[in-house]
Amino acid sequence: IDTNSIEEKISKRTALILPVHFGGYPAELDKIAKICKKNKLNLVEDAAHAVGTRFKNKMIGTHGDAVCFSFHPVKNLAMPAGGVITLNRNMKKFEKELKERRWCGISNRNFFEYDVNQIGWNYYMNEFSAAIGIVQLAKLEKLNHKRKNIAKRYFHELKSENKMPFDNFCSYHLYWIRVKNRTKFIKNMLEKKIEVGIHY
């Protein structure tokens, strides 16, 4: 997210700013938080790539009003499926709505009696995914350290002006680079048995 162009895009309909920590590299949260405060907007982070990343010595997931994490087998916190939304301040109305939407819009559940106040879906995470996630949490720091070492090597050895910066506090879910001849670059990397993807 380009922090220099956020304010010009804010309209009467804007309710929040949602930065994505792409590849695990943290967005400029201090600047974004100031813009949110000035314009009375919520800050909701997409931290799907950034489990274990730090920004200004604080873990990603502790800065925004709300933070979204989604899980996948190839992400830093490797799990079959699922996601989490965390709230960092008292947002009773939003919390109530999230709880209602997580399971078919059901609220006020009391044994066999309940209300369905709104449309919802089945967002419950299955126990299998949750169990794997708990085990993966214990390995997260070690795995992120390996990713950092690989990213450091890419940063020093890949000859391109337009590549992901190196930051000791980044979790490096992905390492992005832009090159003039993508096909040739991919071919060279695959010859060295380095998997390359085209993302977003």
Where are these regions (language model features)?
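PLP-dependent aminotransferase class I/II
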Residues: D2-N4, E8, L16-V20, Y25, ...
